[in-house]
Swiss-Prot record:
One of its GO terms (molecular function) is protein domain specific binding. Involved in biosynthesis of the thiamine precursor thiazole. Catalyzes the conversion of NAD and glycine to adenosine diphosphate 5-(2-hydroxyethyl)-4-methylthiazole-2-carboxylic acid (ADT), an adenylated thiazole intermediate. The reaction includes an iron-dependent sulfide transfer from a conserved cysteine residue of the protein to a thiazole intermediate. The enzyme can only undergo a single turnover, which suggests it is a suicide enzyme. May have additional roles in adaptation to various stress conditions and in DNA damage tolerance. It is an enzyme of class 2 (transferase). Keywords: Chloroplast, Iron, Metal-binding, NAD, Plastid, Thiamine biosynthesis, Transferase, Transit peptide. Its cofactor is Fe cation. Binds 1 Fe cation per subunit. Residues 1-45 form a transit peptide. Substrate binds at A100, E120, Q121, G128, V193, D224, H239, M291, R301, M302, G303. Coiled coil: none annotated. Its EC number is 2.4.2.60. This is Thiamine thiazole synthase 1, chloroplastic. GO terms for biological process: DNA damage response; response to cold; thiamine biosynthetic process; thiazole biosynthetic process.
Length: 354
């Protein structure tokens, strides 16, 4: 039992104060097997060893370093307020941190000259991508979107036309951890977008508030919002619901688009292609991606497949880069160029004019 438990461990940072020499041990290296990336592939091995220079903690006399409670408060407050000042006027605001929004932010963040703010009303970003369909664990991704998983390093089981991630949370946690480590990205979770900034017929940012405040406007008064200006807004608010498709619904309310017909009945084969193809700048300054595309165009719903969310998000990122005058896959200025398998999503004749 101990051997089986040990073999499931990956390299750990659980090390610190030196143990007395009499009690110190140096365990043997451990071999770890992870799931195969594709069918027929062998296990991926990693090793872990504890050297004498990096011994385990002495848990018999363990103590944290001292700290004043006020320091904790000041560190959190100072950093958050600094972020609010920094991103009050930014290059791109992404509204919604589901699979499309996170994929968009990840692709955008590869350009270090572009600053990105992600606004997510939930405390927990990820939208519906923590699980597959009907609260099941596995995530199905149709090819060629598996190339994005290869880039992220997410393992999967491979079939001829699709791949399966054993738990959807593997994708979401991986893309999120890689994305948020980049210096040009800030996630503002538990923050809701209540409205858009519009000047001269162009979207120029978002109106924000704490999510809990937005949910209680009927019970409290005088809870005015804040604002974030942006050169480009990417709306990835998902399909219809209390917090769904809010971007395009607001565009209809203020007369910038004529209608939001909503999704048609489920048709996976049509839906995923349509969502990628129709990802575009719907009004000046605002790009729509993910399931919100189906809401504005009346495309079929796609059900529990996620490839279109990833590729639609990436396409939205390159549309935003084009709007910013940065190298991108839409006009062919990106180097190296996009993989040939994904180019169909960016062909000029496949992009609907805004």
């Amino acid at each position: 039992m101990a051997t089986a438990a040990a073999s499931s461990l990956l390299k750990s940072s659980f090390a610190g104060s030196r143990l007395p020499a009499a009690t110190r041990t140096t365990p043997a290296s451990l071999v770890v097997a992870t799931g195969p990336r594709g069918a027929g592939a062998g296990p991926i091995c990693a090793s872990m060893s504890m050297s004498s220079s990096n011994p385990p903690y002495d848990l018999t006399s363990f103590r944290f370093s001292p700290i004043k409670e006020s320091i904790v408060s000041r560190e959190m407050t100072r950093r958050y307020m600094t972020d609010m000042i920094t991103y009050a006027d930014t290059d791109v605001v992404i509204v919604g941190a589901g699979s499309a929004g996170l994929s968009c932010a990840y692709e955008l963040s590869k350009d270090p000259a572009v600053s990105i703010a992600i606004v997510e009303q939930s405390v927990s970003p990820g939208g519906g991508a923590w699980l597959g369909g009907q609260l099941f664990s596995a995530m199905v991704v149709r090819k060629p979107a598996h190339l994005f998983l290869d880039e992220l390093g997410v393992a999967y089981d491979e079939a001829e036309d699709y791949v399966v991630i054993k738990h959807a949370a593997l994708f979401t946690s991986t893309v999120m951890s890689l994305l948020l480590a980049r210096p040009n990205v800030k996630l503002f979770n538990a923050v809701a977008v209540e409205d858009l900034i519009v000047r001269g017929g162009r979207v120029g940012g978002v109106v924000t508030n704490w999510a809990l405040v937005s949910m209680n406007h009927d019970t409290q008064s005088c809870m005015d919002p804040n604002v974030m200006e942006a050169k480009v807004v990417v709306s990835s608010c998902g399909h219809d619901g209390p917090f769904g498709a809010t971007g395009v619904k607001r565009l209809q309310d203020i007369g910038m688009i004529s209608a939001v017909p909503g999704m048609k009945a489920l048709d996976m084969n049509t839906a995923e292609d349509e969502i990628v193809r129709l990802t575009r700048e719907v009004v000046p300054g605002m790009i729509v991606t993910g399931m919100e595309v189906a809401e504005i165009d009346g495309a079929p719903r796609m059900g529990p497949t996620f490839g279109a969310m990833m590729i639609s998000g990436q396409k939205a990122a390159h549309l935003a880069l084009k709007a910013l005058g940065r190298p991108n896959a839409v006009d062919g200025t990106m180097s190296p160029p996009l993989r040939e398998e994904l180019m169909i999503a960016y062909k000029d004749d496949e992009v609907v004019d805004a």
